[in-house]
């Protein structure tokens, strides 16, 4: 039997524990056929990953569910409770009356009775049937942050998701949500890496006891939308060389030392192991100071989700100026 990676966990404010490393299932087109993708995910499970991050808009829920079922049926894992499965409510379903049906559809795709974590994907709403990333002004609808969160709380009370949270929420939008929340968001999943450190959001979430989870911790290196600002950063390259680590390990260790978890995706088995070999060593204060000097810039502005005649008119408004 091949060796399995060991994953530390973080206890969320919902009293549930989440593995600090999640395997991302957002895959650029063309997405492999169902059976092929399920086989890929099953190999990831064999390596030892148990936290999987998906979303209704990724088109990967069904394949992930199939892999989870195969892992349980084959005895590779002891049962559903070994997994931590996250999915997300897409913007077209971000309405109080649409959330429960959307969650039930996600559970059906996955073949599961409950999610470990359900996130609001973005703080906005679009018309159902809108063409992905080709939105017109008619597609943008008012977003009821209070009603949407109330429906998320109901899903939690029904036992359909153990924890609920948000994704891509600024401090200001989180503050507005918290005004009426009876259940705190357990997680805010956001873009976070050494070139976008979330220096404003991270302390805010820590103060509110909301865990921050990083997507794009390496700027999606190796994908069609990748950038090299992390993996070819000279500060990280030098630190990695001095510590006999990979650049990715240094970048991920930095995120871990900020108290955040992260979502990774690689189909290279060696890197699957390398990316979690970050928990038994530390960055020095000098190295942290060097990383602190790296210029900052948000990489994904989500320009497609704003419209000058819509509820959110600019990226500045979407991110509340935190660019």
Curated annotation (Swiss-Prot):
Positions bearing the site annotation: Lowers pKa of active site Tyr: 88
A GO BP annotation: indole alkaloid biosynthetic process
One Pfam match: Aldo_ket_red
Annotated disulfide bonds: none
Binding site for NADP(+): 53, 167-168, 189, 215-220, 289-297
Protein keywords: Alkaloid metabolism, NADP, Oxidoreductase
pH dependence per the entry: Optimum pH is 7-8.
InterPro entries the record matches: AKR, Aldo/ket_reductase_CS, NADP_OxRdtase_dom, NADP_OxRdtase_dom_sf
Family: Belongs to the aldo/keto reductase family.
Protein task: Oxidoreductase involved in the biosynthesis of akuammilan monoterpene indole alkaloids (MIAs) natural products, components with various biological properties such as antidiabetic, antibacterial, anti-inflammatory, anticancer, and antimalarial activities. Catalyzes the conversion of rhazimal to rhazimol.
Protein known as: Rhazimal reductase 2
Organism: Alstonia scholaris (Dogbane)
Gene transcribed to yield this protein: RHR2
């Amino acid at each position: 039997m091949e060796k399995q990676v060991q994953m530390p966990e973080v206890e969320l404010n919902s009293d549930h524990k989440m593995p600090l490393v999640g395997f991302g299932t957002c895959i650029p087109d063309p997405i492999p056929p169902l059976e092929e993708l399920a086989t890929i995910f099953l190999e990831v499970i064999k390596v030892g990953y148990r936290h999987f991050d998906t979303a209704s808009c990724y088109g990967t829920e069904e394949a992930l569910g199939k892999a989870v079922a195969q892992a349980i049926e084959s005895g590779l894992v002891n049962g559903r409770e070994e997994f931590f499965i996250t999915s997300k409510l897409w913007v077209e379903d971000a309405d109080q009356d649409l959330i429960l049906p959307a969650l039930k559809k996600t559970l059906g795709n996955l073949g599961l009775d409950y999610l470990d974590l359900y996130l609001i994907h973005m703080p906005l709403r679009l018309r159902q049937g809108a063409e992905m990333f080709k939105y017109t002004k008619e597609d943008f609808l008012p977003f009821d942050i209070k009603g949407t969160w109330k429906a998320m709380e109901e899903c939690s009370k029904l036992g359909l998701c153990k924890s609920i949270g948000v994704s891509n929420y600024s401090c200001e939008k989180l503050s507005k949500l918290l005004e009426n929340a009876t259940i705190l968001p357990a997680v805010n999943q956001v873009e976070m890496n050494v070139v976008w450190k979330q220096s404003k959001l991270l302390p805010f979430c820590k103060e509110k006891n909301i865990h921050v989870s990083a997507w794009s911790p390496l700027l999606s290196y190796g994908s069609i939308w990748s950038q090299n600002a992390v993996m070819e950063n000279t500060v990280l390259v030098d630190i990695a060389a001095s510590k006999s680590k990979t650049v990715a390990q240094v970048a991920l260790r930095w995120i871990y030392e900020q108290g955040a978890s992260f979502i990774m995706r690689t189909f290279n088995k060696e890197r699957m192991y390398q990316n979690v070999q970050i928990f038994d060593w530390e960055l020095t204060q000098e190295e942290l100071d060097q990383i602190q000097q790296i210029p900052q810039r948000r990489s994904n502005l989500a320009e497609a989700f704003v419209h000058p005649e819509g509820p959110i008119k600019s990226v500045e408004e979407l991110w509340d100026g935190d660019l």
